[in-house]
Every structure is written in C-alpha cells, then in structure tokens.
Amino acid sequence: MSQSYINVIGAGLAGSEAAYQIAKRGIPVKLYEMRGVKSTPQHKTDNFAELVCSNSFRGDSLTNAVGLLKEEMRRLDSIIMRNGEAHRVPAGGAMAVDREGYSEAVTEEIHKHPLIEVIRDEITDIPGDAITVIATGPLTSDSLAAKIHELNGGDGFYFYDAAAPIVDKNTIDINKVYLKSRYDKGEAAYLNCPMTKEEFMAFHEALTTAEEAPLNSFEKEKYFEGCMPIEVMAKRGIKTMLYGPMKPVGLEYPEDYKGPRDGEFKTPYAVVQLRQDNAAGSLYNIVGFQTHLKWGEQKRVFQMIPGLENAEFVRYGVMHRNSYMDSPNLLNQTFATRKNPNLFFAGQMTGVEGYVESAASGLVAGINAVRRFNGESEVVFPQTTAIGALPHYITHTDSKHFQPMNVNFGIIKELEGPRIRDKKERYEAIATRALKDLEKFLNY
C-alpha cells in the first residue's frame, strides 16, 4: 500500500486506544485532536481520554459483563485499562479512577510513543481513500458531524447525556454521613448521606419543580437510560429514585450513627452516595445524580442532601448531545464501513455506550485498521466474548429500533447444553468460556 501511516481522528478513549493498538503493531499513526485549538463546553482539559461524565469504569467482577470486557481488554494490552489500573481510587466492587492522573498518564504515553504523531487540529471532512479511524465521540464538531450525518443518510440519531456534580470533601458535614459500600462489598468506599422519609419527600418536591437549563436544540429530549438526569428520573414517579441511585438496601446505619432517622429502622428511607473522584480523596461525585438543572438550582436543591448543606461544588452537572450512527446499516463487525473498507469508526458514535465499551471499540478498530493496512483479512472476535458480542450486536440489531447499548450478558452467545439456573454460576460459566475462546482466538 502507498499509504505510509494510518489516520486516527479524535483522542478520546476510543481514539487513544486505536492509536496505541496501531502503533504497537509497528504502523505510524497521525493522531488528530482538536482540543488545544478548539474546545468543547464539556471537556475541562486538553488531555487525551478525558472522562467527561463519571470517573467509574463500573463493576470489576467477572460475573459482571463489563468486568469480563475489561479482563479481555487487559489481555489485549489495552492502554486505557493499563493506565486505569495504575490510577485506581477506592470504589468498593467497582473500578474508579483518579480522572486527572489517569488522562494525564494516557496523554504522556501517547505523546512519547515514537510512531504516534499528535496533531492538534480540527478535521472538518471525512478523508477520502486513506485508512482512517474516526473516533471523535459524542461531542464531534459541527462541521465533521454534518459529514457523518450525510454518511448516515441524513437521519438524526441522538440522545442527551448528563454528568453529575462534584463536591469538595472538606465542605461535607462528616457527622451526618457514614462510610460504607453496599452490602459491605469490597472496602468501605462510599460516603452515604441518609434521608428520612420526610427529608426525601421534601427533596423530591424540590427536584421535580427545579428549573432546568434550556436545550440548545428544538429536538425532542431523548435520554440514554444509563445516564438519565436525576430530575427526569424523579418526574417518573415518587419512588423511582428509591429503586435507582437513592436505593437504601444494603446501606444500613452504622451502630454509632447519631443523625436523624425514622424511628428504630436500621436502614434509611433513602440514601445519596458520594464516590471518591481523585486519588487524593479531596473530591467526591454524587453517584447517579447527572443533571441538567441550572447551576443555581443545583446548589439549592442538592444542598438539601444531609451532609451537603454547606458543600462547595467544584463542578456542576452538565448535559450534552450525543450523536450516534446507523451502525446496523453502515458498519461491519470490524468497525469498518460497508461502503469504504478503509474507513473505520469507533467509540460512542457507533452506538456502544460507556467508557469501557468505547475503548473496546477503538481496540478492535485499531487492530483491523492495521490488518487492512497490511493487506490482511480483518478479524471478527468470537461472539462468545464480550469484545466480540458488542460489535456483533450494534451491526446486526434492527436498525429501526437501534439505540446505544452497554455490554451485557444478554448479547453474548448463549452457553450450549442445559441452561444453568443459578445466575451467578451461569455468568461465571460464560466468563470462563469467553476467556478460553479469546485465548484460542489470539493463539490461532
């Protein structure tokens, strides 16, 4: 091939992973990132793989589909997983990272790689025949988004995403909260703000009547269920939050708790959890409280949470518009487009949802871009693995009803033989098979 390098556009999680996977296989990369030249309202730095929403990579157990996906990615030498592990912060049974330290480490490793040339510039058009991975994410610039929109057949696929507020730990009233992980799983990693029924009812009323920031679009509000604004959830019903982010089960009061409670109940009526957001432990995010309320309203309403009456918000919640492609009609399982095998897409724009899933798509796209570059046949990971099931789902589901998807055991190929009734045992069996099949696939 006359082309001497591969283009990667976008240095988020998917683009950073794709660039690394290409370079580690000996192919030069030109990595384009517009931040540094043109910023977005949601990004706070110019670093690569910045985590805009939560700092959590979610569950770490192999009986959790995202835990399996992460383990598969570790075995494929994922730059995102490796640096995530190096910058972990306590989060019970989940994997959370110091977002600044982690993204700085990814940025440094990319910059130091001898085969990766970083170009700070905005790309406004889709390259012609050059082998290219586009991983510009949900915050793609308007000009490039318009070109992708044309590729999409003019159809608008989108939903709205929101991020949760972050507070300064030193401004939390520690006497009103307690340290505990749900069901005491893992280390006690969350600060829990318990509410009585009276406190919850007042909070729910304030939340459902608070003023929201206006959307910069005439389009209908559509949300991805995994990142729904807390005020939207609250409006679905008085108890919706009690089965979601404010679920109290497994978060019993400690014996020495002296704050307000409903009679002699051992468990609060509702609980708001705070999760450590940086390695120093000075910042905590409000778990599941992504929001689109006006900033003044966020301060007023969220300071009703016990322990946060005088909390200082170092970042308020924000919302942004996520666009995604008609992947069932446009993409192959390799993340190459059906019409142009030299053009690959990766990340949330393909319809995978979540940090880990985005990085995984970049990993697969990067590997296949190299194979295309070398004139080799592209690879499709086994559908028995999480990293193979995800691209299979987004490219084979019904286009009319296509929406972004997190990895889950439901999209992984079913086990052969009699169904295992116990869910944990079934998931363990799926994970064991996945890792064996991945090993066979890599050694083939």
From Swiss-Prot:
Top-level enzyme category: transferase
GO BP terms in the entry: tRNA methylation; tRNA wobble uridine modification
Record bears the keyword Transcription regulation: no
Keywords: Cytoplasm, FAD, Flavoprotein, Methyltransferase, NAD, NADP, Transferase, tRNA processing
InterPro entries given in the database record: FAD/NAD-bd_sf, MnmG-rel, MnmG-rel_CS, MnmG_N, TrmFO
Domain of life (superkingdom): Bacteria
EC number per UniProt: 2.1.1.74
Pfam families: GIDA (PF01134)
Gene3D superfamilies with a match to the protein in the record: FAD/NAD(P)-binding domain (3.50.50.60)
Swiss-Prot/TrEMBL cofactor(s): FAD
HAMAP family the UniProt entry points to: TrmFO
Protein name: Methylenetetrahydrofolate--tRNA-(uracil-5-)-methyltransferase TrmFO
Species of the source: Streptococcus agalactiae serotype V (strain ATCC BAA-611 / 2603 V/R)
